[in-house]
Each structure stands twice: as C-alpha cells, then as structure tokens.
C-alpha cells in the first residue's frame, strides 16, 4: 500500500500541545496520529488508525489462537441487565447514563459482562455447549473525573473484552489460564515490558484477578514486588499483622497533657520530652492516627467512617477505595464534624468511636492494631492524649481495613522478602468472576446428570488504545516516535528531497517497486516542502526505515536510514529495493 504525504490527511506540529503531560500524548498529537476532540476524547487520524488496527490485529490473532470467537455488541445498552447485577448503581458517577425520547434509561458501555451473559443464556442450555470463550474489540466509555495523559486515561477508548463460560470451577481455571497465556503472547508481540500482579476485583467481583502492568515512571498504579517473586497492585497487598500480645503486665492507660501537638511529629516530640519512657523513645509508629471520611453508597446514602492507622503511615486513598468498594470515598467536611459534637478535632481517640461509641461512627483499624498493642492517641479532650491505650482491652474497633499505605521494605505477605515499590500503567486485567453474573441473570445449563447448574464465568480485558500509548511511551527519542516494526504505520518512509524532477521520478519508481514487494510505503512526495522539514517529519512520525532520494542520485546512490539507531549508509540505487526489503523482513 502506498500513502502519499501530498494527499495524506496529516498535519504535524512543532510545539507540544499545552495540555499534554507525557511523551506519548505530546508525540501522538504532534506527529498527526490523534487529535483532541474534548477532554479525554480523541479523533484517530489515518496514521494513528493504521497503528491502532495493527495492535487490534495482534490481539485478534492471539484470541483466535486461544479458541475464542469474535462477536460485536452495541455500545448503547439498556439499564435492566445492569440493575440485575447492581452495577447500575455500583458504578456511581463512573458511567455515562442517558434517556431515550420515551424516558427509558440507557448507558454507554463501560464493559459488557451482562450482555455477554444474556446472549449465552439466550442461545445455550446444555453442558455440551461449553466451554465457550467469546470476545469483541470495541469502544468503551467511562466518565473519568480527571482524564489525563492523552489516550492513556480517556473517557472513550478501545478495549478487547472477552468472557469465558464453563460448567465448573476446574473449567474456569483452564479458561483463565488460556487467557493469561494469550495476554503474555500479545504483549510480547507488541514489545511491551509487563509484570503480572495480583489485584482487587472492585465492582467486577469474583474470586481472583490479576493485572498486567507496564512499568513506567508515569504510571498511576503503584505495585510491589519482592525478591522471592511476590507481585501485587498496592491496593491488593495484605498486611502481615503481628501476633496478639497478652494483656498481663501491660501498663494501664493514662491521659497526659500534650499542648500544641497538631501533627504526629509534634506529638512524638512532646511525648519524648514530657512523658518519656524508660526502654526506648516514642516514635510515630507508636501513635494511632484517626482519619475521617464519608462513604457514599450506591443507593445514595452517606456514612461517616473513621479509619485508624499507625502514625508513621498515611491512608492510601486507592487502598481505602478498594477496601470499601462499591462505596465511593468523600471528604469529611466541617458540616460533618458539626453533626458529631463528641469529636474534638485534632484529639479524637477510639473512646468516642465505633458504632457503640458516643459518636456512633463506624471505626475500622489497620491490621497491625491487634489485641495487646499499645498506642498513643487522642483523649477526646483539647490538648490531651492517652498513652498506653491497649487494643482489645481499652477499646474494640468495629473491624479491620487495608487502608494504610504500603512502604518499601514492608514484608511480603507470602514471606518472600522485603517489598520494593514501582509504578506502572494497567494494560490488561483478568478476572475469575465465578457465578456472580450468571446467578444474577439466571444463566444455567443442564449438566451431565440432567441437573441445572449455574455457569461459572471469567472476564478478560485488554486496553488496546492504552497499550498503543504505552508502546509510544517506551519508543521515542528527542526527535519523535520510533515505532517497533510490527506496529509502524508503514514499513518504509521514502523521502524525495530537492527540486530535480529526476529525483521525484526515481522516488516514485522506488515507492512503486517497494509496494510490489508487499511493503507498506509512506512516500513524502510534497513538492514545495524543504528537505529539513521532510527530515523532521520523518523523524517525528517514526517509521523504522527511511529511504532518502536526493542529491546522491547523480552518483547512482540513495540513503538508507535506521530510525532507531540513527545509522545511515549510501546504497546503490539498483540495490535499494532489496536492501529495504531485507531491513524490513530481516
């Protein structure tokens, strides 16, 4: 195929878009691959669409090889199936909802579990029909509160979602593993570094889920790994709780004056100065910090919540949100404090917390707050703290919550060594859903004994546009994009420079011969554009092989450039087509 830049719908830019923060966003816009239509919404231009289709084709080939079959669902979906699974409300403000002219409710699909389930229910009724895996590559919609980083986190995006249907859990495990291995092959073919980590299931539910993360400093997700092979999204890390301590011999709780201690740091300093202990100094880890939030439940009700964590750690909003899902976390405002006069701001302790406490506010604590652990915490009086307040003896929380931040050096939950922290972008997520959706939508089949059984399901997603952005993020230099050969919009970029008609005629002939060889050719045949601009555009667009026809033609030579290495050489005109074909095909 031949694309002529003189007629190609393309406009390159020399300056970065003002809203762009990351390299992939800047370069995909500047090189004319995408164009912003609205916050989090992008138009795909011809070059971008070619790369996107190549990513889709890799995904399609590996899904087909894994035995999955492609279908295509509408993006506009009715409310009723999502009501049956509670996700109409569980998604909260995260989905786009609309009404038709008759007042019926619809949503723009964030994902399609319900619709796939109903389709299989409509067509299949026997164990003989299973196992089944079906997939689609389709546009999805999420009402992101803060779309950012171009197509990495948008409101409209392309996703491959697939679903497996099995009679039993053993079948689900096989389907899950088939998808897992297919994803490994997909990302290897795309040339993407990735790590597979344990993850939380969130609104999807299910017994098991894993994320495929692309490690990068710009990633929004924090994940951990250990020398022994443990890997998890920070939201999924479980805390190794210390053993409970016997109450016998523990000192009694005592309240002390601690004036002017608005922070953990000042509290520790005053405690060591005015209330020192004999064995060792007080540290932030000896304090119990109580943080207040409001949970907004899917039915719209608001519930105040107190979270107690050791003072040397902050509450991680993402871990808290994962722990309380599907509720959403909101700030505890001044008006909320006013409704609870028992709360003395800055000095709140467990004494007034809990559903049985004076405030009536549910109180969840970090798993490290086990029975027998002693703490410095608020005494519910201005300028006073209580020392040696013992969990299980002096206060009893309503439960535990995984909300404290995970730190480098924390022990891995499986004992495989200290954790190290890294950042990454989620490019895929796989879920062993189990029977949640099938149960809610009454998807059953007859088993071998003629008994109706609920089908067990898996759900598997690849962020196609996000994967493309990650490829761009990891394949660029100061001049522009440098596409892996398998994804480049063309195999070779032919550049005709100068004004000599013979140069353009030769470049035209070479481009035609390369197309005849089965190669995709991007041909810069623009007659009134300077060589400098053409070279800058070629480097910005990022086709891996560049063939320059210019002043060397007088000596029977053309220039062959490797975009990634920057190496170039003069080759004989008669050898140019074969040399390009060799460079492309290896």
Curated annotation (Swiss-Prot):
InterPro entries tied to this protein: aa-tRNA-synt_IIb, aa-tRNA-synth_II, aa-tRNA-synth_II/BPL/LPL, Anticodon-bd, Anticodon-bd_dom_sf, Pro-tRNA-ligase_IIa, Pro-tRNA-synth_IIa_bac-type, Pro-tRNA-Synthase_IIa_type1
Question: What does the UniProt entry say about where the protein is found?
Answer: Cytoplasm
Q: Which GO terms describe its cellular component?
A: cytosol
- Which reaction is this enzyme known to catalyze? tRNA(Pro) + L-proline + ATP = L-prolyl-tRNA(Pro) + AMP + diphosphate
- Keyword Cytoplasm included in the entry's annotation: yes
Q: What is its main location?
A: cytoplasm
Enzyme Commission number = 6.1.1.15
Q: Does the keyword Ligase apply?
A: yes
Q: What class of enzyme is it?
A: ligase
Got any disulfides in this one, which pairs? none
A Gene Ontology molecular-function term? ATP binding
Q: Which Gene3D superfamilies match?
A: Anticodon-binding domain, Bira Bifunctional Protein, Domain 2, YbaK/aminoacyl-tRNA synthetase-associated domain
Stretches that traverse the bilayer = none
Q: Name one GO biological process term.
A: prolyl-tRNA aminoacylation
* SUPFAM superfamilies recorded: Class II aaRS ABD-related, Class II aaRS and biotin synthetases, YbaK/ProRS associated domain
Supply the domain comment: Consists of three domains: the N-terminal catalytic domain, the editing domain and the C-terminal anticodon-binding domain.
Quaternary structure annotation from Swiss-Prot or TrEMBL: Homodimer.
PANTHER family per UniProt: MITOCHONDRIAL RIBOSOME PROTEIN L39/PROLYL-TRNA LIGASE FAMILY MEMBER, PROLINE--TRNA LIGASE
- Say which family it is in: Belongs to the class-II aminoacyl-tRNA synthetase family. ProS type 1 subfamily.
Q: What does this protein do?
A: Catalyzes the attachment of proline to tRNA(Pro) in a two-step reaction: proline is first activated by ATP to form Pro-AMP and then transferred to the acceptor end of tRNA(Pro). As ProRS can inadvertently accommodate and process non-cognate amino acids such as alanine and cysteine, to avoid such errors it has two additional distinct editing activities against alanine. One activity is designated as 'pretransfer' editing and involves the tRNA(Pro)-independent hydrolysis of activated Ala-AMP.
Q: What is this protein called?
A: Proline--tRNA ligase
Q: Organism, per UniProt? A: Kineococcus radiotolerans (strain ATCC BAA-149 / DSM 14245 / SRS30216)
This protein's gene is called: proS
